[in-house]
Each structure stands twice: as structure tokens, then as C-alpha cells.
Swiss-Prot record:
It is found in: Nucleus; Nucleus speckle. Pfam families: MA3, MIF4G. Residues 453-569 form the MI domain. Keywords: mRNA processing, mRNA splicing, Nucleus, Phosphoprotein, Spliceosome. It comes from the Eukaryota. One of its GO terms (molecular function) is RNA binding. This is Pre-mRNA-splicing factor CWC22 homolog. InterPro entries: ARM-type_fold (IPR016024), CWC22_splicing_factor (IPR050781), Initiation_fac_eIF4g_MI (IPR003891), MIF4G-like_typ-3 (IPR003890). The lineage of its organism: Eukaryota, Metazoa, Chordata, Craniata, Vertebrata. The keyword Phosphoprotein applies. The modification Phosphoserine is found at residues 38, 60, 106, 829. Required for pre-mRNA splicing as component of the spliceosome. As a component of the minor spliceosome, involved in the splicing of U12-type introns in pre-mRNAs. Promotes exon-junction complex (EJC) assembly. Hinders EIF4A3 from non-specifically binding RNA and escorts it to the splicing machinery to promote EJC assembly on mature mRNAs. Through its role in EJC assembly, required for nonsense-mediated mRNA decay.
Length: 908
């Protein structure tokens, strides 16, 4: 046992010595080769672990010691082999001693090696050269005078690469505009390969900033489309490479970048649909996950530009969810994707705020399919000497000036470099002129970003307040500009309109602001007029809330009642929306104030000029419309005065006629008299002519006498009229001008009534002519029909002797029972004489009365000469009709008596 322990100690001591010598002699290259050993060579730790486990399992101590000694021997052999390999591989190192290197080198070989080392160019090494301090770099640049030389181009290439990498790594949302300006200062046309590589590397390293890099690429693409195309080509190739290699991370980063480029309109949406189709064609867990991540980023954009395409994609996802055997986690991801689509991608907007920096006209969209062969142009990543280096640099400077408008900055730098004092003064004058011109320029913010933020602030303050007093206090503490006063009032009204039902909170808040300052009250007045003019644009719910809010403001006298001046109630000036607004408005006022108080307010004499449109009195049609409107909405009590006004309108018109007639001279009255007299005479002559056709010679003489008397009256009146006409011609012309307007209005109003009168006159004439023709035919008949006609004539006559008519009517039945003929003839002759006298007297009285009435009417209604004359003519004819019938019956009686006398019965 002791010998074995001594052997173990000696072997352990030898091992430590060899190990320490190995550690001392190992260089970094030796360690590198040691790391590259196979796992079999590094397996001694595993062997020791197995030995330990064996000892724990109960193996004998001797067996364990033997196994350990065998392991140590094997380890020593491996170490010897490794040392032998290292010595054979090592090349002679110059900084080693000759003893350590194993060979002796002469001192003459050392300076030749140093010369070779000095001749090596650091820029040609794999890493691009070691770090050069700035002072030494400036020194080297000063030594190079030829800018077209290879060394200068290489140095400028290295500087370009460093600046592009630094700017890309610094970009974010807040400084993207500054980074773009600095980036355009560099020659990105020459370094487009470097720029593409830097952008793709930065995006793959930090995918969370993909939207920022996409906005950067969109801006560069608007100025240099070939750079955007190169980046998109490399992205497509990266995606295809990751898809072939089943590299999910590469596919995720590439697809996310492509999605944001589609949102920025750099890539076409067809590329997106092709990528989704490829990913979902043979679905796996990874491909579905990549497709869902891709769809979340550009789903809203696809919904806008290609709804049919995105519907097909979601239909495919639904089939995968129901049919394919995929992991539970992926199934949940698909369900979440459908929920995101249902919410409208609200957490995944197309372009984030602050990154929409390219105008639509400047955007350039690349149509690059997924399956085409593209050249990544990796040569652009490596330095290559340009024979036209200076010319290309000058061209890019011109492009840079055009993009950045650097003419002014270049002139300022030239002045600072050293120019004459005269040139400085001229430049200062030009700058002063530019400043003066700049003061005149007004910039209009079409995006209205400030307005949107202001409205958002007001909305949040309103929604976070418990009562209107707290809200008013918050809004007043904001201290906004006076120009935004109306916008504040508009926002209060909009918030009120957006509510599902009217809340008194907004009415109290608006009333508080109106009480605080006159400017708020004036703003709400103008808003009321604008809202009423554009009320047809609001929905019914919003319209109701707006009407109730303004009703509250008028009830509390926060707004003056003069705002109702803009309401014009008529059939032409109102729409369905405006009538609904007025209805809700006045019903709400009636609930607040009560009908008596509201009626008293509307009858206020000081406010009547403002209520002329609301309660119109200018036109009976509008008045009737207003009455019907307020009655239909249950507020008929407000229209009592309007109803009285509508009833009194004809009386007022009649009362205004004498006043107009008094102003007229005697000319108009005389002319009206003559016209009325002539009309009456015409009517009489017509009646006499009609009677002469059906009567005998006696009736012809009476009608001719009446005609002569009427014509004599006509000539007398016409003579008087001509004399008065000559006297008052000068005065009549002036009054006629004043009366014409009034006459035209009255004629229009009474046109309908006169038409009815004319129609009645025509029907009456037709009836009289029928009766005349019937009487003329009935004259040849015997006793029964003659008696019946005689009875009718007695009933219709207007005589003072009524007993004779009664006797005649009572005698008819006696004649039927056989009364003697002689008595009947005597009674008939007596009654006929009495009837004749009474008829003549009645006709004379009627004619006198008609003439007096016609004169009075002509004086009162001078403006209606022709119309009144027609009415009088028809009236005279009505009065004359009873007179005609007795005359006709009288003639028929006489003819009957003659026949009886000539008959043989009477002779006997």
C-alpha cells in the first residue's frame, strides 16, 4: 500500500510539473488550437466523473487506483502528442529567443523582416486597418495632395462607412429629420451598398425600431429610388434565404421590415400577398407564426387597398385552424389574429404619429415580385477605385444643394473662410431683405395638429370632471388664446352632441362660460346661427341634444332671445330637420318655463322684431303655416294672437279701402258711377230684349219704354262724367299712381271671390233662359198647365197685394170642382189688372234701389269698376226675373181668354 501511495504522489508531482510547463509555454495560438480539440480529447473530466461514480457504487480501492493510473497514463500520452503537434505546426517567431524557438536565426535576417512589416498597408488587412489616432489620421490626410489617388479614395470610403453606420445607429422618432439631413450630406449614391447593409443590420439587431428604419428608407426612396429598390431586393433575398433554411428569426425580421415598407408605400401590396400565400401554402407552426406576425403589421393597409386579398388570407387561416394539425399555441395565435381584425387593428396603425413624413406625390412604389431573380449587388459593399471620383463628387454636391437648399449656408461658410468686407456687407443686406420677406410670409398649418391637440385636451378635461364647476375651473386654468374661444365653445357643443342622451352638465357648463365673459356668449350666438343653418347635417340624436342645450341657455338667459331672429317659419324656408329642431327646442322651453311664461316672453314688445320670422304676420299663408306647426307640436297656446290676426286680416283690408278712396279725386267716383250705370242699363236692356222675344205687343212697348229711360239716364251720367273728368284730370293722375299698388293687391285677393260670383251669374242666366223657352212653349196649352204657370208667377212676384195671390191659389181647386166660367173670367181679369199695377210698381222700385246701390258701390269700390259692374248686372237680372215671369204669365192668360171667347161654348 505504501508503495502504491508513493507511486501516486510521484505521478501526481510529475503531472503537476508537466501541466505547469505546458501552461507556461502555451501562447494564445496554442490555446486556440487547444480549444479546437475534439470532444474526445477534452473528455478527461468525464472519465474522472465516471471514476468517482464507480467509487461511490462500492468498487474496491485497488480497482479504482488501477483505473486512475491507467487514465493518467493515457492523459500523459495525449499531452505528449499535443506538444509534438504544436512544435511541428509552429513557425519561427521573431520575438522568441533562439532557445525557445528551437532554431537559431542570424542577426542579418531580423532587419529584412522589419522592412516587410513596415511595407504592409493597414488598410489592406482583413479588418480594414488598425485604429489610427485622429492626429495621425489628419497628418496622413495632409500628406495626400492628390484627391483622385487611390489612398485618398480609400480614406474617404472608410470615413463614409463610419459616418453612415453612426447615423443609422443614432436614428429614432424624435431626431429622424436631423439624421436625414446629416445623412444626405454624405455621398449615399456612392455608398448605397454601405447604407443598405447598415440599415438591414440595424433592423435585424433591433426589430422594435423597424417602423423608424422604414420611415428613413421611405424618405431616402423619395429622393433616390434606386437605393430603396436595392434595400427591398436584399430584403426579399433575405426572406427567401430564411424560408429555405427554416430560419424563423430571419423570416420574422425580414417580413416585418417588408410590412412596414408596404405601409410607407415603398413596396407594393402584391408582394405582401405573395409572401402570405407562400407561408400558408404548406402550413407549419413556424410558417403560420411568421404569417401572423407579418399580417399584424400590414393588415390594416391591406384592408384598405385590397379587401378581397385579405379576406382570402383570413379564410385560409380559418381553414388551417379547423383542419390542420398545429400546436395549441399557434391555434391561439390565429384566434388572437381574428380578434385583432375584429377590433380594426387599433393597436397596429398603418403609420405611427410623427413618421408620416413623405407627401403622397413624392412617394415611389416599387413593384417587385417575390419569385424573381434579383442581384443583391454585394460589390457595392466593397471599396472600388473610381476613375471619375472628383466629377461624381461634384455631381452629388449639386444634387445635395437641390435637395437641402444649401445655397445660403454655402455662401455663409465662404464668408467665414475669408472674403472681403464689401462682399460681407452685400451678403448682410441680402440677409436683411430675406428676413423682411420672411416676415411677410404666413405659414398655414393644414394638418391642424395644434387644433387636434387642443380639442383632445378639452375633451379629456371634460371627461375627467365630476361636475360642471370643476370642469370650468380646469378649462379656465389652461389659459388658452382668445382666438380659441369659439373652438372651446364648439368643443363643448360637440361633446354634448356625442352623448347618447342629453346631459344637463353641458348646459350648465356652457351657461357658466356665457356668464363669465361676453366673448363666450357671442361665440355661442354665432354657433347657434351656424348650427341652425347646417342642422340638416346632424343625426336625430345629435340634433335633439343640441336643441335641448340651446333651450337651457335661453331659459337661464345665458343667451339673448334675439338669436331666434334666424328662424323663419314658412313652407319654403324650413326643412324637416329644422322643423324637428324648432319642435324639440320649444317643447324643452315649455318644460322649463311653462306655457304662460313662454307665451308672455314671446309677446314681449321689445323682442317683437326678433320674432317676426318665428311668428310671421306678413303673409296669411305663412301665418297659417306657423299656427298649424305650433298646434301640431302641442303648443297651440302660443298662436292666439296669430289666430286673431288671421281673422282680422279681411277686415283690415276692407277698412283700408275707404282711406285709399278718400285720397282719390272726384274723377274716379264719376267714372265709376257712369260705368255702373251703363252696366245696369245693359242688364235692363238685355232683360227687356229677352222678354220681348216671348211676349206680345204690349210687353214690347213696356220694355222699349224702360230701355229708353235707361238710355237717357246713361247719357246724363256720361255727360256729368266727362265734365268732371275734364276738371279733375290733373289731380287724378297723381292719386292714381298711389292707388295702383293697393288696387292690384286687392284684386288678387278678391279674384277668387269674383270668379265664384261670375260662375253663379252664368248659371242663373242659363236657368232663366231655360225657363223662358219653357214658358214660350207652354203658351199654347190648355187650362191645367196655364193654371200651374200662373200659380208659379203669383208665388214669385214681389207685389204688395198679397191677397190676390192667395185668392188665385185657393181658387184653383174650386175650378176643378166645377166653378162657373163667368166668375172665373171676372176674377182672372180683376186679378190681372191688380197684378199688372203691382208688378210695374215693384219693377220701378227695384230699379231705383239697384241704381242707388250701384252708385254707392262705385264710390266705395272705385278700384273694382269692371268687377262690381258685372256683379250689379247679375244682381239686377236676379231682381228682374220675378218681373219677367208675371209678364209671361199675363200674356199667356190673355191668349187663353181670347180663345175662350172665340170658342162655340162661350157664344152659346
Amino acid at each position: 500500500m505504501k508503495s502504491s501511495v508513493a507511486h501516486m504522489k510521484s505521478s501526481g508531482h510529475n503531472r503537476r510539473e508537466t501541466h505547469s510547463s505546458y501552461r507556461r509555454s502555451s501562447s494564445p495560438e496554442d490555446r486556440y488550437t487547444e480549444q479546437e480539440r475534439s470532444p474526445r480529447d477534452r473528455g478527461y473530466s468525464d472519465y474522472s466523473r465516471s471514476d468517482y461514480e464507480r467509487s461511490r457504487r462500492g468498487y474496491s480501492y485497488d480497482d479504482s487506483m488501477e483505473s486512475r493510473s491507467r487514465d493518467r497514463e493515457k492523459r500523459r500520452e495525449r499531452e505528449r502528442d499535443a506538444d509534438h503537434r504544436k512544435r511541428s505546426r509552429k513557425s519561427p517567431s521573431p520575438d522568441r529567443s533562439p532557445a525557445r524557438g528551437g532554431g537559431q536565426s542570424s542577426p542579418q535576417e531580423e532587419p529584412t523582416w522589419k522592412k516587410k512589416k513596415d511595407e504592409l498597408d493597414p488598410l489592406l488587412t482583413r479588418t480594414g486597418g488598425a485604429y489610427i489616432p485622429p492626429a495621425k489620421l489628419r497628418m496622413m490626410q495632409e500628406q495626400i495632395t492628390d484627391k483622385s489617388s487611390l489612398a485618398y479614395q480609400r480614406m474617404s470610403w472608410e470615413a463614409l462607412k463610419k459616418s453612415i453606420n453612426g447615423l443609422i445607429n443614432k436614428v429614432n422618432i424624435s431626431n429622424i429629420s436631423i439624421i436625414i439631413q446629416e445623412l444626405l450630406q454624405e455621398n449615399i449614391v456612392r455608398g448605397r451598398g454601405l447604407l443598405s447593409r447598415s440599415v438591414l443590420q440595424a433592423q435585424s439587431a433591433s426589430p422594435i425600431f423597424t417602423h423608424v428604419y422604414a420611415a428613413l428608407v421611405a424618405i431616402i426612396n423619395s429622393k433616390f429610388p434606386q437605393i430603396g429598390e436595392l434595400i427591398l431586393k436584399r430584403l426579399i433575398l433575405n426572406f427567401r434565404k430564411g424560408y429555405r433554411r427554416n430560419d424563423k428569426q430571419l423570416c420574422l425580421t425580414a417580413s416585418k421590415f417588408v410590412a412596414h415598407l408596404i405601409n410607407q408605400n415603398v413596396a407594393h401590396e402584391v408582394l405582401c400577398l405573395e409572401m402570405l400565400t407562400l407561408l400558408l401554402e404548406r402550413p407549419t407552426d413556424d410558417s403560420v407564426e411568421v404569417a401572423i406576425g407579418f399580417l399584424k403589421e400590414c393588415g390594416l393597409k391591406l384592408t384598405q387597398v385590397s379587401p378581397r386579398g385579405i379576406n382570402a388570407i383570413f379564410e385560409r387561416l380559418r381553414n388551417i385552424l379547423h383542419e390542420s394539425e398545429i400546436d395549441k399555441r399557434v391555434q391561439y395565435m390565429i384566434e388572437v389574429m381574428f380578434a385583432v381584425r375584429k377590433d380594426g387593428f387599433k393597436d397596429h396603425p398603418v403609420i405611427l404619429e410623427g413618421l408620416d413624413l413623405v407627401e403622397e406625390d413624392d412617394q415611389f412604389t416599387h413593384m417587385l415580385p417575390l419569385e424573381d431573380d434579383y442581384n443583391p449587388e454585394d460589390v457595392l459593399n466593397v471599396f472600388k477605385m473610381d476613375p471619375n471620383f472628383m466629377e461624381n463628387e461634384e455631381k452629388y454636391k449639386a444634387i445635395k444643394k437641390e435637395i437641402l437648399d444649401e445655397g445660403d449656408s454655402d455662401s455663409n461658410t465662404d464668408q467665414g473662410a475669408g472674403s472681403s468686407e464689401d462682399e460681407e456687407e452685400e451678403d448682410e443686406e441680402e440677409e436683411g431683405e430675406d428676413e423682411e420677406g420672411g416676415q411677410k410670409v404666413t405659414i398655414h398649418d393644414k394638418t391642424e395638429i395644434n387644433l387636434v391637440s387642443f380639442r383632445r385636451t378639452i375633451y379629456l378635461a371634460i371627461q375627467s370632471s365630476l361636475d360642471f364647476e370643476e370642469c370650468a375651473h380646469k378649462l379656465l386654468k389652461m389659459e388658452f388664446a382668445e382666438s380659441q374661444t369659439k373652438e372651446l365653445c364648439n368643443m363643448i357643443l360637440d361633446c354634448c352632441a356625442q352623448q347618447r342622451t342629453y346631459e344637463k352638465f353641458f348646459g350648465l357648463l356652457a351657461g357658466r362660460f356665457c356668464m363669465l365673459k361676453k366673448e363666450y356668449m357671442e361665440s355661442f350666438e354665432s354657433i347657434f346661427k351656424e348650427q341652425y343653418d347646417t342642422i340638416h347635417r346632424l343625426e336625430t340624436n345629435k340634433l335633439r341634444n343640441v336643441a335641448k342645450m340651446f333651450a337651457h341657455l335661453l331659459y337661464t338667459d345665458s343667451l339673448p332671445w334675439s338669436v331666434l331672429e334666424c328662424i323663419k317659419l314658412s313652407e319654403e324656408t324650413t326643412t324637416s330637420s329644422s322643423r324637428i329642431f324648432v319642435k324639440i327646442f320649444f317643447q324643452e322651453l315649455c318644460e322649463y318655463m311653462g306655457l304662460p311664461k313662454l307665451n308672455a316672453r314671446l309677446k314681449d314688445e321689445t323682442l317683437q322684431p326678433f320674432f317676426e320670422g318665428l311668428l310671421p304676420r306678413d303673409n296669411p299663408r305663412n301665418t297659417r303655416f306657423a299656427i298649424n306647426f305650433f298646434t301640431s307640436i302641442g303648443l297651440g297656446g302660443l298662436t292666439d294672437e296669430l289666430r286673431e290676426h288671421l281673422k282680422n286680416t279681411p277686415k283690415v283690408i276692407v277698412a283700408q279701402k275707404p282711406e285709399a278712396e278718400q285720397k282719390k279725386p272726384a274723377l274716379t267716383s264719376s267714372s265709376s258711377e257712369s260705368s255702373s250705370a251703363s252696366d245696369s242699363s245693359d242688364s235692363e236692356s238685355d232683360s227687356s230684349e229677352s222678354s220681348s222675344e216671348s211676349s206680345s205687343d204690349a210687353s214690347d212697348s213696356s220694355s222699349s219704354s224702360s230701355t229708353q229711360s235707361s238710355t237717357s239716364g246713361i247719357t246724363a251720367h256720361s255727360a256729368k262724367g266727362t265734365r268732371k273728368k275734364r276738371q279733375g284730370k290733373a289731380r287724378g293722375e297723381e292719386v292714381d299712381k298711389l292707388a295702383r299698388g293697393h288696387q292690384a293687391l286687392e284684386r288678387r285677393r278678391e279674384g277668387g271671390r269674383e270668379d265664384q260670383r261670375h260662375q253663379e251669374g252664368r248659371t242663373e242666366r242659363a236657368r232663366s233662359e231655360r225657363r223662358r223657352a219653357q214658358n214660350s212653349r207652354d203658351a199654347d196649352w190648355r187650362d191645367p198647365l196655364a193654371k200651374h204657370i200662373d200659380d208659379r208667377s203669383h208665388e214669385n212676384s214681389h207685389s204688395r197685394v198679397g191677397n190676390g195671390r192667395e185668392q188665385g191659389s185657393h181658387r184653383e181647386p174650386e175650378d176643378r170642382h166645377g166653378e162657373p166660367k163667368k166668375r172665373r173670367e171676372r176674377r182672372d181679369s180683376f186679378s190681372e189688372n191688380e197684378k199688372q199695377r203691382s208688378r210695374n210698381q215693384d219693377s220701378d222700385n227695384v230699379r231705383r234701389k239697384d241704381r242707388s246701390k250701384s252708385r254707392e258701390r262705385s264710390r266705395r269700390h272705385s278700384g273694382h269698376k269692371g268687377d262690381d259692374a258685372r256683379c250689379q248686372n247679375s244682381a239686377e237680372r236676379r231682381w228682374e226675373k220675378p218681373g219677367r215671369r208675371p209678364e209671361q204669365s199675363r200674356e199667356s192668360k190673355r191668349s187663353q181668354d181670347r180663345r175662350r171667347e172665340k170658342s162655340p161654348t162661350t157664344q152659346k
